[in-house]
Amino acid sequence: MSLQRIVRVSLEHPTSAVCVAGVETLVDVYGSVPEGTEMFEVYGTPGVDVYICPSVERDRERAVARRWHFDMGSQIVVVMNSPSNVNDTVTFKFPTIPAETPRPLAYAVLYLTCVDITLDCDLNCEGRQDRDFVDKLQWVWGPSGHGAVLLVNCDRDSMSSNDQEHCDHHVRCLQDLEDMSVMILRTQGPDALFDDHKLVLHTSRADAERARVFHACGPEDSCEAYRHVLGQNKVSYEVPRFHGEEERFFVEGLSFPDAGFSGLVTFHVTLLDDSNEDFSESPIFTDTVVFRVAPWIMTPSTQPPLEVYVCRVRNNTCFVDAVAELARRAGCKLTVCPQAENRNDRWIQDEMELGYIQAPHKTFPVVFDSPRNGELQNFPYKRILGPDFGYATREPRDNSVSGLDSFGNLEVSPPVVANGKEYPLGRILFGGNLPGSRGRRVTQVVRDFLHAQKVQPPVELFVDWLAVGHVDECLSFVPATDGKGFRMPLASPSACFKLFQEKQKWGHGGALLFQGVIGNQQVNTVSISQVLSNGSLIGYNKFVQSCIDWNREVLKRELGLAERDIVDIPQLFKMERRKAVAFFPDLVNMLVLGKHLGIPKPFGPVINGRCCLEEKVRSLLEPLGLRCTFIDDFTPYHMLHGEVHCGTNVRRQPFSFKWWCMEP
């Protein structure tokens, strides 16, 4: 709401003033009151409401009675609720004192011209511009909250442009307007008022760097009609009244929430009195709206899949075919990045994370490009960015990145409740070192970005013990029809040793791992008994289990998980250069497409014609209604310290829950 305006009246001549509908105007009569005045009378024409507040301690009263005791502490407030057609008046009469020497009454006359001015936007997140809402200065989270939403216009609707839309000062195609939020300036009042008054739309210099405004100045079907009026180097704009009572503006975000930017952007419209050529303009009224830039939102593997991405390289034809078949069963679109574009970089999960942004009027996917910058670095920008598909990235200025900055180290949980707090969009998970220890961590610019989105508060896990150092090496999430609606498969050396011990007990100690591996001469078979007699392997996996157990407790605490929500998947690790890598293909590093799971084929011990590791995983996951498909990734991925999840990526359906309804 605008600050209360003060108007001073005079006994010498009538006073003229402009007021805004619904906004209080404080009338100062004290400077003109005859000395000794004890009473006064006040009259308002129809449509003018006058209120008297006798003192600070007492509530104001409507001036129904015409005569009032005069007190220097009294306040006189005038309100009009509809625009003027003619000048309305308020008249003050001051009887002179002493009464035995009567003189003519003293009069003060106030002529009022009322104008209605509102700056409106979609404050209730209902897809319409609401002019009846009161508190536009606050942006309030929650199901009963309010405030308008702004999308970062980070897609590329115009195929004639090589840049994202927010890099352009022009509207290149009309589809671009669909990504913007509408802001409407409504004015009602005598046309003559605007001969010596003007309206100025303005924002702060900081907010001008974070949003851009276009004014619709002509035919709606012409791109040239949309004039860039605010944003970047433009902080104010005198609004011409092209359309009389209603001017439409289109607003686009330029920056996602980040360190130093909460996501809030504010715009004001101010009515200025420009009637005196000898003086500068004076403000009469300001209306304000606040937008929040929509956060980038990740989707967990439990969300329905829409599109699967995979790279074709020189030795993974069978792998690509297997992923294509799984995508077909799941009803997903398949996008294959050819070798000419990936230049033999197969790690498409590490290159990017697919999420989305949402406003009441529009939702579209946004790819977050990692700072790893391998041979795939151009793929997200050149091949994914396009109409209604946005792009974002964060890179440290000194280019100091580690393996932990690849996005295999970036996951998100399904919706959870932890410690009495709801996380309806889940929580982001990424890995680092132990608190207070030296080691690899996710680069600060990425951490700042993820924390600033607010709606999926991050949890940091301990992954520095892993050679690659990604959270997807030790956990995943799969959908379930009971409980919390999901399970968390977690790598477990203890479960693997227990399984092997059972098989050895039943006389299968000679069963071999790695039988049937095709196309690689570096792998020697090893029996169950050899594994169970390898003291260094057992000792190292006890250490690995302790690291996983640390994460297990963090996840139980931060995600509100119980033991029944965790599925222990048998998995062993070995040491290379003092870090852990998977001993056999990492079973939790899976591709989740609804009920269809693409799991790395472990080449485990074959007993009675069946791989005992595959059989165990099926027994754990298929009762949940899931279908397990084991994909041979041994040579093209496992031998390079990656698996199925590392070599694929998935665009998923956005949450049905609206982010502005949550309470961070």
UniProtKB/Swiss-Prot annotation:
What the record says about temperature is:
Optimum temperature is 37 degrees Celsius.
What is the top EC class of this enzyme, as a single word? hydrolase
- Provide the coiled-coil residue spans: none
Task: Give the protein's cofactors.
Answer: Ca(2+)
A GO molecular function held by the record: calcium ion binding
> Does this UniProt record's set of keywords contain Kinase?
no
> What InterPro entries does this protein's entry cite?
Cupredoxin, PAD, PAD_C, PAD_central_sf, PAD_N, PAD_N_sf, Prot_Arg_deaminase_cen_dom
Entry comment describing in which tissues the protein is expressed: Found in wool follicles, keratinizing epithelia of the ruminal mucosa, embryonic hoof and tongue filiform papillae.
What are the protein's UniProt keywords?
Calcium, Cytoplasm, Hydrolase
Which subcellular locations apply to this protein?
A: Cytoplasm
- Summary of the function given for this chain in its UniProt record: Catalyzes the deimination of arginine residues of proteins.
The entry's family comment says: Belongs to the protein arginine deiminase family.
Q: What name goes with this protein?
A: Protein-arginine deiminase type-3
Q: Which organism is it from?
A: Ovis aries (Sheep)
Query: Lineage of this protein's species?
Result: Eukaryota, Metazoa, Chordata, Craniata, Vertebrata
